[in-house]
Amino acid sequence: MQKMQCHLRRPLHSSSSFSSQAVMMTKPMQEHKKEYTAQQALFRPSGIVTSIPVPLAGSALLPYHVSSTLYQSKSLSSSEHNKANGGSPQEHIAMESSAEEVDCFKNTCLPSELSPCSQNDFKPTNGDIDMQSPSKLMSGSMIISNFSTAMVHTIVNETLESMTSFKATKPVDTNADYLTKTIKGKPVLSLCDQAAPQQNKASSKDMFAEHLSKSIIKHSLDKSKSVLPNIDKKPVSKEHMLVLGEESQLTLGETPKFLDFSDNSPQYCVPECKDSVGFGFSLEALPPCSMMTSQKSDLKGVMKDKVVTRHNLTNTAFEPLSFGQESSFRPSQTLSSAVLTCVDSLHVEDKQKIRDRNVIPDTPPSTPLVPSQTSSEWDIKKLTKQLKGELAKEFAPATPPSTPHNSSVGSLSENEQTTIEKEEFMLKLMRSLSEEVESSEGEEHPEMDVKSEHSGKKGQFADALATHIISLATEVAASHLDHEITQEFKVQNSHLTVPSQRSMLPALSHSDESIQTCSFASDMAAGVIAEAEKVANTRSCMLFGHERTICHVEGDRGKAEEKLDVEDIAHPREVETCVLSLPSCMPGLTYKYPSCESVTDEYAGHIIQVLKQEGGNSELIMDQYASRLAYRSVKSGVREAAKTVKVKCSLKLFPMHTSHVKTNKELLFSSKEHHQEVDKKRQRKKYGSHPCKYQTCDRTQDPCRNELSELYRFSASLASSITRDVKKQLTAPKVDLPKSSTDCCLFEKSECVDNRENVTGPEFSKSCQPLQNHGLCQNTSSLSGYSCGESAHTVEQYARKVVGDTLELSLGPAVFLNSETTTSPDRITYAEKLSPLINEACRYCDLKESHGCIRNSAQLFSKQGPCASAKPSSHSKLSSIRQKSRIFHLDVPQIHLNLDKRAVLAEKIVAEAIEKAERELSNTSLAADSGIGQDGISFAESLTTEIMTTAMTNAGHAVSSSKEVEDFQSTESLGSQQMNLSVGEDSTGSWSNLSFEDDHQDESSSFHHLSESSNGNSSSWSSLGLEGDLYENNLSFPTSDSDGPDDRESEQEDGAEGLQPSGKTLLIVNIDVEPGAVDPQLRVILQWLIPRRRKLENFIFSTLQRRSLSYFQSSYRREDGKWAMSCRL
């Protein structure tokens, strides 16, 4: 509930109608506070300031009904307090929520809610009022709720009718003359009745409202008389119209009576509302502010007389109300003013303490000499401060009261000193925030916009003025009915019949002053209600897209619509300041109307700013920054998810019927995938722009609306061209089009694009026109320019591929993998990368079962689709998306891979590359650590000998054990074994950088036992049959390879020398992951020695290996079955 209160926060002085409800309650304090909080937290939102929309708040309000006790007390005191309040200038403070309540009820009340209140419930019979018993009338709270709903609905309808029949820009004098003529000429008819033929349902609504309002008010008065028959009524007469004072101690038993209308003085009365020009309210209609109580009952005497004139209306609209004012009742029924004016728990606690300390029982509070500041800006600042204070208390570290100072810090360790400094700094920060909360004056925020503040003052003035208007109309209606009831038992009552309801009493005569006041009030009422309706419509269109219910207003609005459109053009930014869409990632204290999420984000930004200014610890700044970043990330994610949900819900609830969609549905009949594309783009079009006739709807849309609408237009034109080609080519002769022709029309922009408008047809000419300059239209019509025609199957397949690519572009490239992930430590293979892409692309075109040629063609088409033409686009967002998609398509290899047979090979290749990269990182420090240099030649020679011996032994074992395996597989395994060895050269030419892996424990893949058998200076050359003179020659290989033709010829001759007829021929093939991965000399020597050791005479090297082997084959000679190195290598 506290969270909801934060969202539903409104200025404190705009809750008068709810305050009157709270005043009339007879429940104890604690029980009332709970019920009041639950009720008013849902009733508070106006649809402008809060983040919860009005329809949701209204629907949530339905289960919460106030008990019958509240409604009985309200019905008892409705007309009494209306009479007592009069037209005093102080009553405007209780009226600022009327315009918002009207909007709230308009959004929440359905016509079906009016049905329980039929005219049969209150039907006069035999000229007397057949009143129902209080138990019957108040049997259920639902009936009372429907009563108030009907009254509000009636007020709004009649106001709109008056706006239709009255020109708001007429001068006051003209209106006064016209009003006088109308009253003299036709005293029975009213302008509302004249406007009735313009609206078909006006008369029925008037009939129902008149019976309902009269019966309710009459029942209230009769019941008050029956409950209190012995209490004297005190008529109070004043010098000016309907401005009445009351005693400070106003109880339920005291019912001040209205003017005695027998005086027939023209100064006392306001003209009857039904006969006035622009008053716009029914004589019997009881608005939601009819239960007002006196907001100045704390005065010790009778209030001074004031004249309600145009000047007073303008001036009193800005008079604030102090927090201490309240209506005093009996001691058992006294309520705190904090309950009446504040929902926020912080304000309740604060003001409750003040009232408990200052109020003396049975005495009214003292009148404040100077009205306290109660403007909306002040309340917002105070709320922000209190929220910050609570957050500061919440986040304050639990530190002891006595913090150690610098004197004791010296003996502590460095870590403890740092911790203490951090705690002291945070404690000072929190204390400063708390002191700022407790201060009475709030500092001005420089980020506030002057224009927005000005518009906020305008809204306050409009609220107060509209409440004045409704108050005057209510009092006139109540006084009229009161006069009728007093005359009821003397003369046979005929006032409640429909013809005589509009008759004017003699006492309600019209003075010039009252006529001018009513004319001015009518002008202002039209503007106020139009402004409120405009704001409500704008917010509804922006958040929910209720096009049919909100944007297209029922009935003929006439001149009010024109005035509204003019105001939209003249003041384009005022509505946007009211409809407060939270800005994204704006630092600082910039929110005028704070909510929970804005205060949280704002608090983190403020903490960071203070930390930087005061030189705080960098760790604290980073912590606060990280928390704000995480919060914003979560908020943005939730916002994106909410957008998606809104689009889906709006599509289900309100299907859009536009010319583009209708035309697409008529044309796209040949391919199911076209309908999928249109549906997707229809959702984005619907979210992007609503068919609202108010310009403010387009002005307050999401910034991505233009991009989405352009994407929709592009997809519509593309779908139209594809459909036209399909329809035309379905009847064409089935001759296959050459692939070169298809590629030509996809790669090049032909002349048909320039004549796009004529080719596409009148339906899509408008959508294609904005995109001709950008080159986004697909050139599918150029296929028909060739003489051979085109097959229908080819066109349909192309259409499916384009649609699939368009859907991929719409959903974004987030599902696709990046090409850089191939070298990640997770060892993502090409097979793993290709499989999700195939499934993703084929999911939209229903081709999962065929991954062969269809997938290949899909890649071809999708590469040349909208993604290939993204560079001319003017929008950077679309360009970036399409560029990513283009890169993705280029990354997919254009070959067929048998994933079942080649997955193992790909896995090994990637694994070797990763292992090799890891080894190279450690090789740089190996030379320095090992100490191998000019003095370590013997160690290098012995180590090389052991490597050769172990390699030949292991490889020979592998070859002999895999005689049954294919030659290619064995060669592949041998090649992968040797790639594990990485050899480098230092400046002296000796082998110093050697690394070998110990991960594999099988004897055919590593040299794990090499280190055990090597002692650093001994060697086992005798095992190879090498002569001792080899010791005299340093075993070193040159780095350069000879590329001459002589070496190649000798290589071929020597290779042919050793070839003899044998059972099998071994083909040695090396696969290099990247150039220079393995020393080619060492690899060729080992691969040449292995088959010789195993007596395999027939072995063939690849072309690339022959060059590396040429220097070695020319330097050996075979003598008596022994190996001898006859010359230096």
From Swiss-Prot:
<dbReference type="GO" id="GO:0003091">
    <property type="term" value="P:renal water homeostasis"/>
</dbReference>
<dbReference type="GO" id="GO:0030866">
    <property type="term" value="P:cortical actin cytoskeleton organization"/>
</dbReference>
<dbReference type="GO" id="GO:0032991">
    <property type="term" value="C:protein-containing complex"/>
</dbReference>
<protein>
    <recommendedName>
        <fullName>A-kinase anchor protein 11</fullName>
    </recommendedName>
</protein>
<feature type="compositionally biased region" description="Polar residues">
    <location>
        <begin position="404"/>
        <end position="416"/>
    </location>
</feature>
<feature type="modified residue" description="Phosphoserine">
    <location>
        <position position="439"/>
    </location>
</feature>
<keyword id="KW-0576">Peroxisome</keyword>
<feature type="compositionally biased region" description="Polar residues">
    <location>
        <begin position="1033"/>
        <end position="1042"/>
    </location>
</feature>
<feature type="compositionally biased region" description="Low complexity">
    <location>
        <begin position="1012"/>
        <end position="1028"/>
    </location>
</feature>
<dbReference type="GO" id="GO:0005737">
    <property type="term" value="C:cytoplasm"/>
</dbReference>
<feature type="compositionally biased region" description="Basic and acidic residues">
    <location>
        <begin position="442"/>
        <end position="455"/>
    </location>
</feature>
<feature type="compositionally biased region" description="Acidic residues">
    <location>
        <begin position="1043"/>
        <end position="1056"/>
    </location>
</feature>
<feature type="region of interest" description="Disordered">
    <location>
        <begin position="962"/>
        <end position="1061"/>
    </location>
</feature>
<feature type="modified residue" description="Phosphoserine">
    <location>
        <position position="835"/>
    </location>
</feature>
<comment type="function">
    <text>Binds to type II regulatory subunits of protein kinase A and anchors/targets them.</text>
</comment>
<keyword id="KW-0597">Phosphoprotein</keyword>
<feature type="region of interest" description="Disordered">
    <location>
        <begin position="394"/>
        <end position="416"/>
    </location>
</feature>
<feature type="compositionally biased region" description="Basic residues">
    <location>
        <begin position="1"/>
        <end position="12"/>
    </location>
</feature>
<dbReference type="GO" id="GO:1903142">
    <property type="term" value="P:positive regulation of establishment of endothelial barrier"/>
</dbReference>
<dbReference type="GO" id="GO:0034236">
    <property type="term" value="F:protein kinase A catalytic subunit binding"/>
</dbReference>
<dbReference type="GO" id="GO:0005777">
    <property type="term" value="C:peroxisome"/>
</dbReference>
<feature type="modified residue" description="Phosphothreonine">
    <location>
        <position position="251"/>
    </location>
</feature>
<feature type="modified residue" description="Phosphothreonine">
    <location>
        <position position="363"/>
    </location>
</feature>
<feature type="region of interest" description="Disordered">
    <location>
        <begin position="1"/>
        <end position="21"/>
    </location>
</feature>
<feature type="modified residue" description="Phosphoserine">
    <location>
        <position position="440"/>
    </location>
</feature>
<dbReference type="GO" id="GO:0008157">
    <property type="term" value="F:protein phosphatase 1 binding"/>
</dbReference>
<dbReference type="GO" id="GO:0034237">
    <property type="term" value="F:protein kinase A regulatory subunit binding"/>
</dbReference>
<feature type="region of interest" description="PKA-RII binding region">
    <location>
        <begin position="905"/>
        <end position="918"/>
    </location>
</feature>
<feature type="modified residue" description="Phosphothreonine">
    <location>
        <position position="742"/>
    </location>
</feature>
<feature type="region of interest" description="Disordered">
    <location>
        <begin position="354"/>
        <end position="376"/>
    </location>
</feature>
<dbReference type="InterPro" id="IPR008382">
    <property type="entry name" value="SPHK1-interactor_AKAP_110"/>
</dbReference>
<feature type="compositionally biased region" description="Polar residues">
    <location>
        <begin position="968"/>
        <end position="995"/>
    </location>
</feature>
<feature type="compositionally biased region" description="Basic and acidic residues">
    <location>
        <begin position="1002"/>
        <end position="1011"/>
    </location>
</feature>
<feature type="modified residue" description="Phosphoserine">
    <location>
        <position position="434"/>
    </location>
</feature>
<dbReference type="GO" id="GO:0008104">
    <property type="term" value="P:protein localization"/>
</dbReference>
<feature type="region of interest" description="Disordered">
    <location>
        <begin position="434"/>
        <end position="455"/>
    </location>
</feature>
<feature type="modified residue" description="Phosphoserine">
    <location>
        <position position="595"/>
    </location>
</feature>
<dbReference type="GO" id="GO:0036010">
    <property type="term" value="P:protein localization to endosome"/>
</dbReference>
<dbReference type="GO" id="GO:0051018">
    <property type="term" value="F:protein kinase A binding"/>
</dbReference>
<dbReference type="GO" id="GO:0019207">
    <property type="term" value="F:kinase regulator activity"/>
</dbReference>
